[in-house]
Amino acid sequence: MDNFEQVLNALQQGEVIAYPTEGVFGVGCDPDNPDAIQKLLDLKQRPVEKGLILIAASYEQLLPYIDESQLTPEQLATVHATWPGPYTWIMPASDKVSNWVSGQFDSIAVRVTDHPLVQKMCNAFGKPLTSTSANLSGLPPCMTTEEVEQQLGDKLVAILRGETSGRDKPSEIRDAKTSQILRQG
């Protein structure tokens, strides 16, 4: 059953949603809503200092959140060559980004997804979503809708039904300034 509109409505109302990504299920919310982010951090038992990933349908959706002026054309070309896809890049954060999203850093983790359902959700919402793996602290990330329902069902308003893209691990994380791999994908 397609529950896209129900999940979009929950997102617009400031709720935390779960959704399939390239490798695992993610949980996320409106990156510009501190109350929604607090719900997400509480659900994950995640400290605000760690920061969150933003996942978007297009690079244009990320532009308000990053400071491109701190990156060279070559650095940007390296980033763009990997998107859309399962690559998360650490980029300089713009002044718009609250520390609810960036945590203790002056940078922000961003990804342009190639997952069709997440692209559709970001396009319908009109901006990126925060993204972190769907799991309780200490447990492995959820890979299916059923696993999300078992682990987090009583804590979530809406789960976007769908399949992951088949990767068996979270996205690779790299630093846009150095290309250093921070998390193997």
UniProtKB/Swiss-Prot annotation:
GO molecular function, one term: L-threonylcarbamoyladenylate synthase
Region Disordered: start-end pairs: 163-185
Main location: cytoplasm
Transmembrane segments: none
NCBIfam families: L-threonylcarbamoyladenylate synthase
Function: Required for the formation of a threonylcarbamoyl group on adenosine at position 37 (t(6)A37) in tRNAs that read codons beginning with adenine. Catalyzes the conversion of L-threonine, HCO(3)(-)/CO(2) and ATP to give threonylcarbamoyl-AMP (TC-AMP) as the acyladenylate intermediate, with the release of diphosphate.
Protein name according to UniProt: Threonylcarbamoyl-AMP synthase
UniProt source species: Vibrio parahaemolyticus serotype O3:K6 (strain RIMD 2210633)
